[in-house]
Amino acid sequence: MTTSADLATRYRRVLPSFLAPYYGEPISIDRGDGSYVWDLEGNRYLDFFGGVLTTMIGHNHPAVTAAVQSQAAKVLHTSTLYLSEPMIEFAEMVCEVSGIPDARVYLTPSGSEANDAALLLATSYRASNQILAIRNSYHGRVFSAQAITSHSSWRSTSHSGLQVQFVHGGYRLRSPFRDLDDEAFTAACVDDLVQVLDMTSAGDVAAMIAEPIQGVGGFATPPDGLFGAFGKELSNRGILFISDEVQTGWGRTGEHFWGYQAHGIVPDMLTFAKGVGNGITLAGVVARAEIMDTIDVLQFSTFGGNPLSAAAGIATLRTVRSEDLQGNAKVMGERFADAMRPVADATSWIAEMRGRGLMWAFEICEPGGIEPDKARTGEFHEACRRHGLLVGKGGLYGNVVRLAPMLNVSAEELDEGIAALRAAIDEVG
């Protein structure tokens, strides 16, 4: 029988070294059901990361599985050269829930490509290659997305055709404004934005792109209203606002369907990916028609909106809405916060617990300060696994543990995860 160790050996032989699986002894994922996965050895784990927030409503969800199986028996692929009812129906659903007026959607296979398309639209619409992004941001692995990623451990190159400036925003713990209250913090960030625009731009910036909650950046969560305050300054100068909803969309934050809705702003564009396919590759960019129609040459996507992915997206989005999984995210998120915040406050090496809905993170530092403790983060991550819980890592210094349960997680499953976290914290000491 093949073992996880066998697969790890084969993995290292054929895959690039920059792909680093989790854990000192990597585990295989052989099968899943609901909030649980099993490895090849039959060990069961409670999955609080969902393949980086991508399995969103549970492994092997019956509605998604049935939709994919039904579509696979008809046709797997058509491309955008032909009419496809699943693609059109999914696009209609996304436009309806986007909140963007007169919306159009361009479908892609990944969030990186969605952000690339948004940048193409913005720079074409504004006839400018100048982009604003947020410090500690991550927007993908394609060439253009690397330029707007403010995260040294994820930037493979400094070369770019874009002129990018980074402003203060989401990552409050290490901000020079961290001791300010929400209102003063927001005002200071707006002042920084104005100064960057006045000092470093040529006056015709194309767009700002921002994550409402920074994903790879360790679920760094800005004060509500920050991007709305930015938006007032941007709109005065004709600058577009792009909300990267790859990790925050579809009700994940509980209080809102989209992360941008916490900020009193409607973006000119939003990008999405990950969870809406519940594990099947599906992404896209939504924009007002006048922006989308800026591109007047032929465009094409081989795999974007393919029938199989669209079928998965339709089933996932229907489930999210019909079962009010946004509401469940809010209730379960509050349950998680009530249980874990006292534990985090009492743990000297947890510098900050942050997040909302079903997006939570612990930033792990030297006791009593904010010096990153990457080694202890690794110990905690391994301890969670030993207690049967799969969680993610992230943060600028690799010292953040991220948790993102399924949107339909039950109270019993959540409590099981909380018990595992407490046990892991006790083990690390």
Could you describe each region identified by the protein language model?
Residues M1-G429:
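Conserved N-terminal phosphate-binding loop of PLP-dependent enzymes in the Aspartate aminotransferase
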